[in-house]
Amino acid sequence: MNKFYIYNSFKHEALINVKVKPYAKQNLIGNFVIINNIPYIKLAIKATPEQGKANEGIIHYLAKEWELSRSSIEIIKGHTHSLKTILIKNINEDYLNLIINAYIK
């Protein structure tokens, strides 16, 4: 089984890779897809990828969906690309597993 995230137990932070599809009919988190041996969670966002609107939409949607504060979610890689790396701060690994396992099929 692939590791679907990287967790730092000292900082209580996690890195998750997402593959974003903008212009979606609805915001939706899909299952994982493997690209170049790296797992990405599929994410459809209604927002357009202009002037950071899609990135803001990603943060807002994930925070709401996963019941996290928006300030705890940060895009750290791929600001202008569909493949992104998300940093989640102040998260317990057990809660992270609960979130992630919902999307593993």
UniProtKB/Swiss-Prot annotation:
Give the matching SUPFAM superfamilies. Answer: YggU-like
Give the intrachain disulfide bonds.
none
InterPro entries to which the protein is assigned, alphabetical: DUF167 (IPR003746), YggU-like_sf (IPR036591)
Q: Which GO terms describe its cellular component?
A: cytoplasm
Q: Which residues form the signal peptide?
A: none
Similarity comment: family membership: Belongs to the UPF0235 family.
Extract the PANTHER family matched here. Answer: UPF0235 PROTEIN C15ORF40 (PTHR13420:SF7)
Output this protein's name.
UPF0235 protein RP839
Organism equals Rickettsia prowazekii (strain Madrid E)
